[in-house]
Each structure stands twice: as C-alpha cells, then as structure tokens.
C-alpha cells in the first residue's frame, strides 16, 4: 500500500468531517460531535507527524492535490487544537440559545473546514477557493449579532478588504501558472528553489503575494475592521485572532523561495509590517478595553511575523505563528478574568526605573545576547536579537512593576532562561522550515533596528511622561490610531455604501401615559 496516499487520505478526511459536521445541526446543535471531530483531527495530525518522523510517509513526492509536509502537519495540529478548545468554550457560551447556537455551530464548522482545506492544499486553485470560502463563512459569524452597528460596519469593511486580498492572490496564482505551467505549489517551490533570480512576472507575483498577506493580516491602514469585530461573539474573536488572521504568514512561508528572491516584495513587507508593528504596539499602550488591546496586539504581532518572513527567518515566523495562536486563543477566551487583573495594574502606581537601573539592564541584556551570538557563532539578521535585548532590558529594568517586585538576580536569571528557551525553540522550528538568505541584507536590519529604537522612545514617553501637557496631544493621537481608520472608513462607505442597523433609542419611544402608569 502506498503510504503517501494513505497520509494524504487521512489529511483529506479532516476537512470532510468538518463539513459533514456542519450538516448535523438541523434539530439541535451537536456540540459533542463537533468536539469529537476536532479531537480526531488533532490525533490524525499527530499520527501523521509520527509517520513522517519515522519516514513511513515520503515528503518528496510532488504533483498531489493534498500536500503532506512538516509545515502542513504543524499547522493542521494547531488548527485542530484551537478548534477543539473553541468548540468546548462555545458550547457553554451559546447555551440557552437553541436557534442561534445551531446557526453558530453550522458556520463555525464550515469555517474550520475551509481553514483546514487551505492548510492541506497543494493545488493553487483549491487553495484559492478555500481562501475565499473562509472569508464568506467567517462573515456570517462576524454579523452573528446583526443589530450591532459596529459589528456590521466592521464586517462590511472586512468583506471589501478580503476581496482585495483575494484579487491579489488570484493574480499571483495565474501568473505563477503561466510562468511555470503547473498548479501544484510543491512544483513551483522546487522550480524557484533551483533559481538564483526571478523573471519579471515572478517578481510581480511575489509582490501580489506580499500585498495579499498584508491585507489578510490587517496591516495599516486597512486595520480598523479587526478592532471593531470584538463586537462579535468572544469565541469568534478567538478563532479569528488565533487561526485565521495568521494565514497571511502561512501564505508567505509556503511560497518562501519566491519571496526571498524579490527585493520589492521584501521591502513592502519590511516597510508596512515594520511600521505596523511599532505603531500598533504603542497604540495598544493607550487603550483601556481588554479586547481592543488584544486586537491592537494582534496587528503588531502579525506585522512582526511578516517582517520575519521578509528577513528570510521563516522558522522564526512559524514559531511566532504557533505561539501567537495559542496565546491569543487563551487571552480572548479568558478576557473576562483579564478585566480584573488589568484594572489592578492600572490602579497601582508604576515605579519608574532610575538611570542606573536602565544602564544596568541594558548592559546585562546586551551581554547575554552578544555572548550567545559569539559562543554559538550565529549569523544572519541581527535585528531579532536587538528586539530580544530590548525585551530583556525592559524585563530587568521594570522589575519593580505595578503589582509585583522581583530581585535583580531573579530577573537576570529569567532573562537567561528565556534566551536559552528561545534559541532552542528557534532551532527546533528550523527542523520544519529553514531560514533563507535574502537580498535586503544589512539594509533590512538597519531599517528594523531604526524602528525598534523609535519604539523604545515612544514606549518611554507614553509610559513615564504621558501626564505632561505636551504629551497629551500625542497620547490622544495614539489613542485614536492617528485617525487612519476613520479616513479609510469614509472612503470605504463612499465607494461601497451599506445600510447599518438602526439603534434603539428609548428616549424617542412614544408611550401613552395611560400605559406608562398602569
């Protein structure tokens, strides 16, 4: 028996089960079946991972509609795990709404089936159809509460932006088929890997892929819908932030050889993704709503993931994708408990580190990172190590935080542990997806380094000098996201207007006095 076909059949079984599960909710929502399908998908992906490790399944065979690869297996296991947790949470969240939970579970299972189809597809047309289907089915979940104006407006904007991303992806797919004469992603990956340069059409296809990823990941200025969809049910937000919005990064990873040979695609990702990373992180510091803060955090994290892809650090992008998905699923599903802890942090007074503490933290973090680079003889882009050094600097300098106070030795030790764990995880991810040398070189490193320095300046001003008169206008601008979404929304509604639900206004409700005082 051909184990390659067995593995492909097992992977194909997972989306089929999700689609069939969406059809079993005519009388009542079958939550147990949905949980069982998600759990079965997780077990099948784990079994296939073991089969690949022991070489029972050959990964080198191309020309199949279903792609069995290490990358697809990791993503498949991740999506099925998120699906299982989401379904279990949703069963309690939607309890008591008999008619609504049937509709909710039906579209949830369809969305999950489409996401899995994108992940396992090795055929570009199948990928395209499933990519479109994700957007359409997710739209039904985003407008689950059709009487909420913000939710309807966000879904409307997302609907338009999704069409833009799909147009870019379709253009890239047609160009790649014209250039390489095949619809299979694995064949294109192999052909481009053997090349040292791209044709003009391939360059254009890489640019379209980069634009599709930027729009899919809600990068500035097409980001507003991601902030406003928090009006949707909480598990929908968790699914969106943990398993759907990061598909832009997945798209770049599966077309990695094409991206690293295109200077224009890399610089588009570096500029837009880098600016989004810094601005979204600073805007997040000014917001008070837990869900809105998480949404801005997702924008920043997606921007950083796209920057990693532009620098050729695809193993780091994969690690980032998996870690972000697990964290955001937990954060959104635990948003209710986060409100209390967030309130405590805001009510407690932060102790500003002294100049000596900042110098000590900076020297210690720099020594850790430089020592590791020297001992392990590491090469490649150094801006990620600069980012890690900044994170450890903040960890050590702000050890006397809002709620807790830790010793210097403890924080330095924690920094060393984080550095070791990060290095081990990065090396582990390189066994699945390897990094590639890009043409941006030191220029890309310099650009990201400049943005990180600007982030530190903004962080210091917003955190420790936000009460100054001259900082209030700056903070107000950050809080509003520099009004970028307002301009985009106006343009959006002018080009493609929509009718929003009418709000219920009790003050204008005319009630006769006889009925009012009965």
UniProtKB/Swiss-Prot annotation:
Deletion consequences: Cells do not grow in low DIC levels, increased carboxysome content. Decreased ability to accumulate and fix DIC under DIC-limiting conditions.
GO cellular component annotations of the record: plasma membrane
Protein name per Swiss-Prot or TrEMBL: Probable inorganic carbon transporter subunit DabB
Activity regulation (UniProt): Intracellular DIC accumulation is sensitive to CCCP (carbonyl cyanide-m-chlorophenylhydrazone) and DCCD (N,N-dicyclohexylcarbodiimide) and therefore likely driven by either proton gradient, ATP, or both.
Role description: Part of an energy-coupled inorganic carbon pump involved in transport of dissolved inorganic carbon (DIC) with downstream gene dabA (Tcr_0854); has been suggested to be a proton-DIC symporter.
Places the protein is found: Cell inner membrane
Keywords: Cell inner membrane, Cell membrane, Membrane, Transmembrane, Transmembrane helix, Transport
Organism phylogeny: Bacteria, Pseudomonadati, Pseudomonadota, Gammaproteobacteria, Thiotrichales
Family: Belongs to the inorganic carbon transporter (TC 9.A.2) DabB family.
Molecular function GO labels: NADH dehydrogenase (ubiquinone) activity
Topology of the protein relative to the lipid bilayer: Multi-pass membrane protein
Induction cue: Induced by growth in low levels of dissolved inorganic carbon (DIC) (at protein level).
Quaternary assembly: Forms a complex with DabA.
GO biological process: ATP synthesis coupled electron transport; electron transport coupled proton transport
Pfam families named among the record's database cross-references: Proton_antipo_M (PF00361)
Organism: Hydrogenovibrio crunogenus (strain DSM 25203 / XCL-2) (Thiomicrospira crunogena)
Residue stretches spanning the membrane: 3-23, 37-57, 65-85, 114-134, 165-185, 207-227, 242-262, 264-284, 302-322, 358-378, 379-399, 403-423, 442-462
InterPro entries tied to this protein: ND/Mrp_TM, NU5C-like, Transporter_DabB
Chief site of localization: membrane
């Amino acid at each position: 028996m051909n184990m390659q076909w067995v593995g492909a059949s097992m992977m194909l079984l997972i989306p089929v089960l999700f689609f069939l599960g969406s059809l079993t909710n005519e009388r009542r929502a079958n939550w147990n079946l949905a949980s069982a399908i998600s759990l079965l998908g997780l077990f099948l992906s784990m079994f296939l991972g073991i089969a690949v490790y022991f070489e029972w399944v050959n990964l080198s065979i191309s020309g199949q509609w279903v792609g069995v690869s290490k990358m697809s297996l990791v993503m498949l296991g991740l999506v099925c795990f998120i699906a299982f947790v989401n379904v279990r949470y949703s069963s309690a969240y939607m309890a008591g709404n008999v008619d609504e939970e049937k509709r909710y579970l039906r579209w949830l299972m369809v969305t999950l089936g489409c996401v899995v189809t994108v992940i396992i597809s090795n055929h570009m047309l199948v990928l395209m159809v499933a990519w479109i289907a994700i957007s359409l089915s997710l739209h039904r979940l985003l407008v689950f509460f059709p009487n909420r104006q913000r939710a309807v407006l966000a879904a409307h904007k997302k609907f338009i932006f999704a069409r833009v991303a799909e147009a870019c992806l379709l253009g890239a797919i047609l160009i790649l088929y014209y250039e390489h004469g095949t619809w299979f992603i694995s064949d294109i990956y192999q052909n481009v890997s053997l090349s040292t340069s791209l044709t003009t059409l391939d360059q254009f296809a890489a640019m379209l892929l980069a634009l599709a990823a930027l729009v899919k990941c809600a990068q500035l200025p097409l980001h507003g819908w991601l902030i406003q969809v928090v009006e949707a049910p909480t598990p929908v937000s968790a699914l969106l932030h943990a398993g759907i919005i990061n598909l832009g990064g997945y798209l770049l990873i599966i077309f990695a050889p094409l991206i690293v040979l295109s200077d224009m695609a890399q610089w588009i990702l570096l500029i837009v993704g880098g600016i989004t990373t810094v601005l979204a992180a600073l805007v997040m510091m000014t917001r008070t709503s837990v869900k809105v803060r998480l949404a801005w955090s997702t924008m920043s994290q997606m921007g950083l993931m796209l920057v990693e892809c532009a620098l050729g650090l695809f193993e780091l992008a994969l690690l980032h994708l998996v870690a972000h998905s697990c964290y955001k699923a937990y954060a959104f599903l635990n948003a209710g408990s986060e409100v209390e802890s967030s309130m405590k942090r805001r009510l407690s007074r932060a102790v500003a580190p002294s100049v000596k503490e900042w110098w000590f933290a900076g020297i210690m973090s720099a020594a850790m990172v430089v020592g590791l680079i020297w001992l392990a003889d590491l090469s490649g882009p150094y801006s990620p190590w600069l980012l890690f050094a900044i994170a450890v600097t903040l960890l050590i300098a702000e050890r006397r935080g809002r709620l807790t106070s830790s010793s210097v030795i403890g924080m330095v030790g924690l920094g060393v542990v984080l550095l070791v764990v990060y290095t081990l995880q990065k090396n582990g991810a390189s066994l699945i997806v390897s990094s590639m040398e890009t043409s941006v070189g030191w220029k890309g490193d310099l650009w990201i380094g400049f943005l990180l320095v600007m982030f530190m300046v903004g962080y210091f001003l917003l955190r420790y000098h936000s009460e100054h008169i001259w900082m209030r206008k700056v903070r107000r601008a950050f809080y509003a996201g520099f009004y970028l979404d307002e301009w985009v929304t106006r343009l959006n509604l002018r080009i493609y207007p929509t009718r929003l639900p009418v709000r219920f206004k009790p003050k204008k409700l005319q009630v006769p006095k006889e009925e009012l005082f009965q």
